[in-house]
Design a protein with these regions (language model features):
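Structured, acidic catalytic/metal-binding patches in enzyme active sites
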Residues: 1-157
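A cross-kingdom marker for long, charged
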Residues: 151-210
């Protein structure tokens, strides 16, 4: 898996201007305590993911990086000896995340993320609040407000995956009770899982806080 995170014939220095490289390098050293001298061969989207997780940890005063929600519930399910099924493999997930965009495009988005850090932090706070409140309309509005993905990228990263998952869920859910954990952006919009489950005839209701 680590091999798939690395660039073969490029470096971050080749993908960025000298000024942008220096800016990103300084920010990564400040936030992640390591710069592009160590991360420079890693695909920009992977660097961006690691950077975002560190920012999330800092603004929420977490002592360690948060565990992904799907991984957290997977561990709980296995501990309770429940059957766990992946809607896609880790390799498939990593391939989509790291190889769906050209490396230059990934680098440009990383530079933009660093340059617009304050805006990104504010958006992350609002998104977190909306998620905890179960406000799907707010989540969708916030995403549309600052959505850097092109239509083609959204199709690959969100829509196609949702279509694949809904086919699997339609086969599983009529026969057994299922708990489904996905990223919040896979829930909302016309192609979101909630809307598609309703179209398939399922009743979808929010779970009240216990």
């Amino acid at each position: 898996m680590m091999k798939g995170m690395m660039m073969k014939d490029s470096t971050e220095k080749q993908l960025m201007s000298e000024a942008d490289y220096a800016l990103v390098d300084a920010e990564l050293k400040d936030v992640m305590k390591m710069g592009l001298n160590k991360l420079g061969k890693m695909k920009p989207m992977m660097v961006s993911t690691m950077y975002s997780m560190m920012i999330y940890s800092k603004i929420n005063n977490l002592k360690k990086q948060p565990e992904a929600v799907d991984i957290l519930f997977q561990k709980k399910a296995l501990k309770q000896k429940k059957n766990v099924i992946g809607l896609e493999t880790i390799d498939q997930q990593m391939d989509i995340m790291l190889n769906s965009m050209p490396l230059k495009r990934q680098a440009d988005l990383l530079v933009k993320e660093v340059k617009e850090k304050e805006k990104g932090v504010e958006l992350l706070k609002k998104m977190n609040e909306a998620y905890l409140a179960g406000d799907l309309q707010k989540i969708e509005a916030l995403n549309n407000e600052d959505d850097d993905m092109t239509a083609d990228e959204k199709k690959i990263m969100i829509d196609n995956r949702n279509a694949n998952w809904i086919n699997q869920l339609n086969a599983l859910m009529p026969t057994k009770s299922c708990f489904i954990a996905v990223g919040c952006m896979h829930l909302v919009g016309d192609t979101g899982l909630i809307g598609q489950l309703k179209k398939s005839g399922f009743t979808v209701e929010a779970v009240k806080n216990l």
